[in-house]
């Protein structure tokens, strides 16, 4: 269904874009997050937004598209769920 979850709670369900389905985009988002969660769930850095892209440290997590939440909404949601 393309839902990316953090600690069992929905983080994002990416919208489909012309070049990729929402499910495909969710695999990329999950892969970008895996870098942090493979180390465990403690001390995950906060997300921030640069030029409309959600980052954790220097890792781009997601570039929102039409139909997605805004980058700031996603960063805020991530920061609530990351703990």
Region locations from a protein language model:
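N-terminal targeting peptides and non-cytosolic leader segments immediately upstream
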Residues: 1-83
